[in-house]
A protein has these predicted regions:
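Conserved N-terminal beta1-alpha1 strand-loop-helix module at the mouth
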Residues: 1-207
Length: 207
């Protein structure tokens, strides 16, 4: 079995892009949500260095045309859709290019969550399960054990308050295909603590 995917979100500085990639991140997230303290302009994201890790844009309220335009300008590989976009929107971006966020706490049962995710079969590359009922980057965690029985038709990433002290437990219990790290590996919003990043990614990759 291959090692879980590791995404580090909220890139704002060149040294964090390079440091996270060197630590073993597979995906790096660039946020284009105006309400986020980690928000970048497309030009700012475009100016950050290219590394081996794939570049992911995080979008909440943008139109399809805006998403596609920013992806082109900032040279992004994937779009993480965090605004409840429907399957048609995802297909228009490109199923192989989309990570779509879901919020388990919006659902009364695991079956309800699974049904929503099933509607996106063939429309997205990865699902991402985040804490809360909207948005992300708030540092809250999901109930790992409650997700252990989830078997959606696509690979999924776990997000929400993950860092060096709980990411190994999250992987062991919830069994996602990967994890998304943000506030749990920061010294302040948008500024990564590379020691926390390295400790977290060692746990993810089993180094």
């Amino acid at each position: 079995m291959s090692a879980p995917l590791a995404k580090v979100c909220g890139m704002t500085r060149a040294e964090d892009v390079v440091g996270c990639a060197e630590a073993g991140a597979d995906l790096l997230g660039f946020i284009f949500a105006a309400k986020s303290p980690r928000c970048l302009t497309p030009a700012q994201a475009a100016a950050l260095p290219r590394v081996a890790a794939k570049r992911v844009g995080v979008f909440v309220e943008q139109t399809l045309e805006e998403v596609l335009g920013i992806m082109a300008e900032a040279e992004l590989d994937l779009a993480q859709l965090h605004g409840g976009q429907d399957p048609d929107f995802c297909r228009a971006v490109g199923p192989h290019r989309v990570i779509r966020a879901f919020w388990p706490q919006k659902h009364p049962t695991l079956g309800s969550l699974a049904a929503e995710m099933a509607a996106f079969d063939g429309a997205i590359r990865y699902a991402l399960l985040d804490a809360g009922t909207s948005g992300g980057g708030h540092g809250k965690s999901l109930d790992f054990a409650a997700l252990a029985e989830l078997a959606p038709p696509m690979p999924w990433l776990l997000a929400g308050g993950l860092g060096p002290d709980n990411v190994a437990e999250a992987l062991r219990i919830a069994k996602p295909h990967g994890v998304d790290l943000n506030s749990g590996v920061e010294s302040s919003p948008g500024l990564k603590d590379l020691q926390k990043v390295r400790r977290s990614l060692w746990a993810v990759k089993g180094v």
